[in-house]
Amino acid sequence: MASKSRNPKAYCYEHPRPALTVDIVLFHRSGSVLLIKRANEPFKGLWAFPGGFVDQDESLEAAVARELEEETGLKGIRLEQIGAFGDPGRDPRGHTVSIVFGGVVDRSIQVRAADDAADAAWHSATRPPKLAFDHKKILKLALKRLADSAKQ
Protein backbone atom coordinates (compact mmCIF):
# COMPACT_ATOMS: atom_id res chain seq x y z
CA MET A 1 0.00 0.00 0.00
CA ALA A 2 1.44 3.36 -1.01
CA SER A 3 1.95 5.86 1.75
CA LYS A 4 -0.06 9.04 1.57
CA SER A 5 1.87 12.27 1.69
CA ARG A 6 0.72 14.69 4.32
CA ASN A 7 -0.76 17.94 3.14
CA PRO A 8 0.18 20.60 5.71
CA LYS A 9 -2.74 22.76 4.57
CA ALA A 10 -5.33 19.99 4.94
CA TYR A 11 -5.92 20.96 8.56
CA CYS A 12 -5.73 24.54 9.65
CA TYR A 13 -5.93 25.62 13.24
CA GLU A 14 -7.61 28.86 14.22
CA HIS A 15 -5.40 29.42 17.23
CA PRO A 16 -1.65 30.00 17.43
CA ARG A 17 0.46 27.19 18.83
CA PRO A 18 3.68 27.31 20.85
CA ALA A 19 6.96 26.25 19.29
CA LEU A 20 8.42 22.93 20.45
CA THR A 21 11.99 22.72 21.73
CA VAL A 22 14.22 20.18 23.45
CA ASP A 23 16.83 20.76 26.16
CA ILE A 24 19.49 18.31 27.31
CA VAL A 25 20.70 18.12 30.92
CA LEU A 26 23.80 15.94 30.93
CA PHE A 27 25.50 15.28 34.26
CA HIS A 28 28.96 13.85 34.87
CA ARG A 29 29.40 11.56 37.90
CA SER A 30 31.89 14.11 39.26
CA GLY A 31 28.99 16.48 40.00
CA SER A 32 29.24 18.68 36.94
CA VAL A 33 26.70 19.52 34.28
CA LEU A 34 27.28 20.24 30.60
CA LEU A 35 26.45 23.79 29.51
CA ILE A 36 26.89 25.78 26.32
CA LYS A 37 27.53 29.52 26.10
CA ARG A 38 24.95 31.09 23.79
CA ALA A 39 26.43 32.76 20.71
CA ASN A 40 23.13 34.39 19.68
CA GLU A 41 20.30 36.37 21.20
CA PRO A 42 18.29 35.95 23.24
CA PHE A 43 20.60 35.65 26.23
CA LYS A 44 23.76 35.93 24.11
CA GLY A 45 26.80 35.21 26.30
CA LEU A 46 24.88 33.37 29.02
CA TRP A 47 25.20 29.68 29.73
CA ALA A 48 22.37 27.28 28.87
CA PHE A 49 21.68 23.62 28.29
CA PRO A 50 22.31 22.27 24.81
CA GLY A 51 19.06 22.26 22.90
CA GLY A 52 16.93 23.91 20.29
CA PHE A 53 13.85 23.81 18.14
CA VAL A 54 12.34 20.55 16.92
CA ASP A 55 12.24 20.49 13.12
CA GLN A 56 9.05 19.73 11.20
CA ASP A 57 8.54 15.94 10.95
CA GLU A 58 11.37 15.27 13.44
CA SER A 59 10.91 13.06 16.49
CA LEU A 60 11.89 14.36 19.92
CA GLU A 61 14.65 11.75 20.15
CA ALA A 62 16.06 12.77 16.75
CA ALA A 63 15.96 16.45 17.75
CA VAL A 64 17.82 15.69 20.99
CA ALA A 65 20.52 13.70 19.19
CA ARG A 66 20.89 16.39 16.51
CA GLU A 67 21.08 19.32 18.95
CA LEU A 68 23.53 17.56 21.27
CA GLU A 69 25.84 16.72 18.38
CA GLU A 70 25.49 20.15 16.72
CA GLU A 71 26.26 22.12 19.87
CA THR A 72 28.75 19.86 21.69
CA GLY A 73 29.98 17.21 19.27
CA LEU A 74 28.62 14.40 21.46
CA LYS A 75 26.95 11.33 19.94
CA GLY A 76 25.40 8.16 21.29
CA ILE A 77 24.64 9.42 24.80
CA ARG A 78 21.79 7.59 26.56
CA LEU A 79 19.12 10.11 27.55
CA GLU A 80 15.55 9.91 28.83
CA GLN A 81 12.71 12.38 29.15
CA ILE A 82 12.61 14.01 32.56
CA GLY A 83 10.03 16.75 32.18
CA ALA A 84 8.36 19.50 30.19
CA PHE A 85 8.45 23.26 30.69
CA GLY A 86 5.91 25.52 29.03
CA ASP A 87 5.55 28.81 30.88
CA PRO A 88 4.45 31.29 28.19
CA GLY A 89 7.13 33.77 29.30
CA ARG A 90 10.10 31.36 29.32
CA ASP A 91 11.42 32.57 25.94
CA PRO A 92 11.32 36.24 24.86
CA ARG A 93 10.93 35.16 21.20
CA GLY A 94 7.49 33.69 21.92
CA HIS A 95 5.71 30.84 23.64
CA THR A 96 7.81 27.66 23.61
CA VAL A 97 7.33 24.30 25.24
CA SER A 98 10.55 22.45 25.99
CA ILE A 99 10.76 18.72 26.47
CA VAL A 100 13.77 18.09 28.71
CA PHE A 101 15.97 15.02 28.41
CA GLY A 102 18.58 14.03 30.96
CA GLY A 103 21.39 11.59 31.42
CA VAL A 104 24.56 10.80 33.33
CA VAL A 105 27.99 9.91 31.97
CA ASP A 106 30.75 8.41 34.07
CA ARG A 107 33.66 8.59 31.69
CA SER A 108 35.71 11.59 30.69
CA ILE A 109 34.14 13.20 27.64
CA GLN A 110 35.65 15.95 25.54
CA VAL A 111 33.13 18.48 24.26
CA ARG A 112 33.53 21.10 21.57
CA ALA A 113 31.36 24.11 20.88
CA ALA A 114 29.75 24.26 17.45
CA ASP A 115 26.69 25.58 15.61
CA ASP A 116 25.16 28.38 17.73
CA ALA A 117 27.24 27.62 20.84
CA ALA A 118 30.19 29.94 21.52
CA ASP A 119 31.58 27.52 24.10
CA ALA A 120 30.76 24.16 25.68
CA ALA A 121 32.08 23.16 29.09
CA TRP A 122 31.39 21.22 32.28
CA HIS A 123 30.30 23.35 35.26
CA SER A 124 29.38 22.67 38.87
CA ALA A 125 25.81 21.39 38.96
CA THR A 126 25.23 22.90 42.40
CA ARG A 127 26.89 26.27 41.70
CA PRO A 128 26.42 26.91 37.98
CA PRO A 129 27.02 30.25 36.29
CA LYS A 130 24.02 32.47 35.52
CA LEU A 131 21.72 30.49 33.24
CA ALA A 132 19.55 31.61 30.31
CA PHE A 133 15.80 31.13 29.98
CA ASP A 134 14.30 29.04 32.83
CA HIS A 135 17.28 26.71 32.91
CA LYS A 136 17.87 27.26 36.63
CA LYS A 137 14.40 25.81 37.24
CA ILE A 138 15.14 22.94 34.84
CA LEU A 139 18.44 22.21 36.62
CA LYS A 140 16.65 22.09 39.97
CA LEU A 141 14.20 19.46 38.66
CA ALA A 142 16.99 17.46 37.00
CA LEU A 143 19.04 17.41 40.22
CA LYS A 144 15.98 16.22 42.15
CA ARG A 145 15.35 13.45 39.62
CA LEU A 146 19.01 12.43 39.80
CA ALA A 147 18.90 12.29 43.62
CA ASP A 148 15.64 10.31 43.54
CA SER A 149 17.05 7.76 41.09
CA ALA A 150 20.19 7.35 43.23
CA LYS A 151 17.99 6.36 46.20
CA GLN A 152 16.39 3.49 44.26
Where do the model's predicted regions map?
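A short beta-turn/loop motif at secondary-structure boundaries
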Residues: 16, 41, 89-91
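Residues that recognize and position ribonucleotide moieties
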Residues: 18, 47, 121
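Short beta-strand-to-turn element immediately C-terminal to the catalytic PLP-Schiff-base lysine
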Residues: 27-28
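Compositionally biased, intrinsically disordered linkers/stalks adjacent to structured regions
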Residues: 146-152
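Conserved Nudix-box catalytic region and its N-terminal flanking loop in Nudix hydrolases
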Residues: 31-70, 74, 152
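Unchanged
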Residues: 54-80, 85-146
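Acidic, metal-coordinating catalytic segment for phosphate/diphosphate chemistry
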Residues: 1-23
